[in-house]
Each structure stands twice: as C-alpha cells, then as structure tokens.
Amino acid sequence: VLLKGHATHVVSPGGPMLVARSATPWLATAGAGDALAGILGALVATHAAVGPVDPALLARLGAAAAVVHGLAAHRASAGGPVTVLDVCAAVPATIAALLRAR
C-alpha cells in the first residue's frame, strides 16, 4: 500500500512501514499521483526483468519512486508552483543525480 502525501507511507504485508519525506507541497496538483505511478511502474518493470518482485521489494520500490518523485518536483519547482509535466521532465536528471551520488 502506498499513501501519497507530504510524507508518503509505503507498507507491505509483514514488512516495515517506509516513509519518504522528499515531497514538496506543490505536488498537490492534478496528475501528480499518475506521475508517481509511472515512476513506480518503470522501477517495477526494470526489476521484474531481473527476477521476481515480492511484496517487500515492491514496498522498497514504492518508497524509491516516492523519493524520485519528490526530488524531481523540487528540481522542477525552484520553490514555486509546478505542473506535473515539469515534474516528469525533471525525472531523468533526478535519477541521474541519484545514480551519481551513490
């Protein structure tokens, strides 16, 4: 279960609750949840190509998607209102920055 909000909560049966706090209040806009679902879908598809995706992994991927979503919104907003198209456009650069930082 993924509950999107200022802090996004993700939990799987028997697993710990994961909380992503990277969101900006500007994500309370039409289509933002769809963008988050798309990011999560891409992560799940990428991992499914390697092996099975169990509920615990799905929860971790949900939390990772929420972090990417929130950071992309911060990148796109520059502190002000943002559209979902701006958030989506910022996703590749956000993922690249996260990969460089690891």
Outline where the language-model segments fall.
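Small-residue (G/A/S/T)-rich helix-start motifs and N-terminal tracts that mark the onset
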Residues: V1-R102
